[in-house]
UniProtKB/Swiss-Prot annotation:
It is an enzyme of class 2 (transferase). Catalyzes the reversible reaction in which hydroxymethyl group from 5,10-methylenetetrahydrofolate is transferred onto alpha-ketoisovalerate to form ketopantoate. It is found in: Cytoplasm. Mg(2+) binds at D43, D82, E114. It comes from Listeria innocua serovar 6a (strain ATCC BAA-680 / CLIP 11262). GO terms for cellular component: cytoplasm. Its main location: cytoplasm. GO terms for biological process: pantothenate biosynthetic process. 3-methyl-2-oxobutanoate binds at D43, S44, D82, K112. It catalyses: 3-methyl-2-oxobutanoate + (6R)-5,10-methylene-5,6,7,8-tetrahydrofolate + H2O = 2-dehydropantoate + (6S)-5,6,7,8-tetrahydrofolate. This is 3-methyl-2-oxobutanoate hydroxymethyltransferase.
Amino acid sequence: MKKPVDFFAMKENGEKITMITAYDYPSAKNVEQAEADMILVGDSLGMVVLGYDSTVPVTMNDMIHHTKAVKRGAPNTFVVTDMPFMTYHGSVDETIQNARKIIQESGAHAVKLEGAGEVVNKIARLTEAGAPVVAHLGLTPQSVGLTGSYKVRAKSVQEAQELIDNALAVEAAGAIAIVLEAIPRQLAEKVTKALTIPTIGIGAGLETDGQVLVYHDIIGYGINRRAKFVKAYADIDETIEPALKNYVNDVKELAFPEVKHSFTMAEEDLKGLYGRE
């Protein structure tokens, strides 16, 4: 299993880092078999798996439950788990206790926090306490309630400079990596060159040290539409829907189960049942 020191070496050597989300045992198993470098148990599970319209309703228990399943499916892959909405915006002590609970109970190797500002101090304190932290800048889904959209971030000079400053701040605080989401590729390149820690892009161009995409987006499973930055590698929904419809039709038409799908008992044993009704 790769560790933070390996990710630092990959950045230094120019080897791209691959991260994929996973939310349960089978998806995690698939991701590990694909030899991805990292798994992100994102609070995006709220929208992708639980059917919420944002990540805000996701709880600590949700993250722990799903991370435990992921760990069983991918025991040899570095796992990062999101700290959900408002679990790191209270006191430092509350943040540390919440991170401790996630790491101890789920087995996650690191936690991910969105934003900068007051979050920078939380990253520093978590790092001091021995909890590896991945930062997340640019489009931060937990803040969409305030920003009102999932549009590209940091397109103006002022916003771009602020993001660079924030990236340097979370690096100084001890973050082991930074996810850069939905920012101009030129800015992502500048940030990547300015930092010694790896950058993982999602909608941030080719120049980041690595890439992350949502499992369901990659394979086309249960999604309504793909974002611009997502490349379609499969569309398994096109296979799933007819398969399920065929099953329903076979049952209705007495075409399933066939004899080969059934169990039998010896004829002499069957005869022994006669007259016992």
